[in-house]
Amino acid sequence: DYTRGRIHIPHVSTKRSVDLIRKYKKMGVNVTAEVTPHHIGLTENKLTEYDTHTKVAPPLRSELDRKALIKGLIEGSINCIATDHAPHTIEEKEMDFIHSPCGMIGLESAFGLSHTVLTKAGASTEKVVQWFTKGPADIMGWNIIPFQIGEPAEIAIIDSKIRWTFKKSHIQSKSKNSPMI
């Protein structure tokens, strides 16, 4: 606040962080923040399996934290969703839990997981799309070019009534390190 600068908080994973971000936004501090699909969709309960695909930084947190992240998005304290896409080779993720690197892939499952979790919490499909598009663009100061007849466009067609199951065959990344499959 003193410098009138801005700060972006990536990978928010705890209720305490959401509370602090909310507090400073109310004070007028130029703070933006993001959450990851895995932090709004998974909890520390997945860690009991010692599956290295669930080893991320920051780590998966409690159900209380997960619900606070969702509330933070819906109320506007959190600005966007970012995948934290972190592919690792099979050999790296087959190491024991302590020595395996942190990270999981996230691009292919990001929207499906986020949409499922957030629409159950009351968000619209349109709002979920905005958290992946307009939210990051606003943080970066980028203009989103409106859809206009005769002009180039970046679009995605989403039928939220179609059931989709994330499978290993959908993965186009360097590795398959995802707890979602």
Tell me what each language-model feature is.
Residues 14, 37, 87, 162-163:
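Short, glycine/acidic-enriched loop or turn micro-motifs at the edges of active sites
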Residues 99, 152-181:
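C-terminal cap of metal-dependent C-N hydrolases
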Residues 1-81:
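Histidine/acidic residue-rich metal-binding segments in metalloenzymes
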Residues 21-22, 93-95, 169-170:
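Short amphipathic alpha-helical segments
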Residues 17-18, 41, 89-91, 166:
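Glycine/Thr-rich phosphate-binding loops of Rossmann-like dinucleotide-binding domains
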Residues 1-4, 53, 72-75, 79-81, ...:
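His/Asp/Glu-enriched, well-ordered alpha-helical/loop segment
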